[in-house]
């Protein structure tokens, strides 16, 4: 359900908007049932920025629009190298445990469900990923975004340690 849409804000950026999940929720009252909808959306620019949002409303389009607005407001930057990660990451939120590992060129995005949406929106092209624990889409998306944003670039690590990037990234 990935769609390229023009952002309605003042800046002229194209975002990748992915609808991850829609849930129908019911409130039982004396006169019967009241139906509502909850939507989970991931928005990214395909170049290292990603955000997610949830929206609730009585109608599906309104819930999706609310979720997209929240996702655009909460966009975070991710440090990538050649369309993949710098190093393997493990992140967890609640019972959702997410493992992401960089992959060589041509591997593609090997991830399931909500993780795939986040990784494609942020602009990752080669990655191996696995989700353990709960398969709750909201928890999986949160864990994936937190893991990606917690990753620091070799330049930042080298600056903190007072070394050069070659000393940090050297194999052996």
Swiss-Prot record:
Cytoplasm in keyword set: no
NCBIfam families hit by this protein: rpsE_bact
Keyword Ribosomal protein included in the entry's annotation: yes
Pfam families named in the record: Ribosomal_S5 (PF00333), Ribosomal_S5_C (PF03719)
Assembly and interaction partners: Part of the 30S ribosomal subunit. Contacts proteins S4 and S8.
Lineage of the organism: Bacteria, Pseudomonadati, Pseudomonadota, Gammaproteobacteria, Candidatus Pseudothioglobaceae
UniProt keyword terms in alphabetical order: Ribonucleoprotein, Ribosomal protein, RNA-binding, rRNA-binding
Function field: With S4 and S12 plays an important role in translational accuracy.
Cited InterPro entries: Ribosomal_Su5_D2-typ_SF, Ribosomal_uS5, Ribosomal_uS5_bac-type, Ribosomal_uS5_C, Ribosomal_uS5_N, Ribosomal_uS5_N_CS, Ribsml_uS5_D2-typ_fold_subgr
UniProt-recorded name of the protein: Small ribosomal subunit protein uS5
UniProt cross-references to Gene3D superfamilies, sorted A to Z: 3.30.160.20, 3.30.230.10
Gene that specifies this protein: rpsE
GO molecular function, one term: structural constituent of ribosome
UniProt-listed GO biological process terms: translation
Domain text: The N-terminal domain interacts with the head of the 30S subunit; the C-terminal domain interacts with the body and contacts protein S4. The interaction surface between S4 and S5 is involved in control of translational fidelity.
Domain S5 DRBM: 15-78
Entry's family note: Belongs to the universal ribosomal protein uS5 family.
Top-level taxon of the source organism: Bacteria
GO CC, one annotated term: small ribosomal subunit
